[in-house]
């Protein structure tokens, strides 16, 4: 129901990841032992954090729809809107969980999730 807010929230994904990436990389030169934690370790670690973050985000979004701790953003919608929103979150979460190894870019994930949410919304 709130397309502008949804676009803003999806945009936060790329903003948050970019802030983490820049901050972590700026702190990397101060690591404990550069002989053990090489620059190759940095790239591998950031890639793993991205994969884990996408998987966790997908699981958390599913849990907030199916589990006991429902999200007020969806629960307070009118019933006809709630159904489409919940379906969209579940489908976007499934996409994130199943395709996270193919593309870990925050902007790519946000774009695909946005397309799914638009396709499943009800009016």
Sequence positions of predicted segments:
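Active-site activation/catalytic loop segments of kinase-like enzymes and analogous catalytic loops
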Residues: 1-31, 57-73
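ATP/Mg2+ or Mg2+-diphosphate-binding catalytic cores
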Residues: 10, 40-123
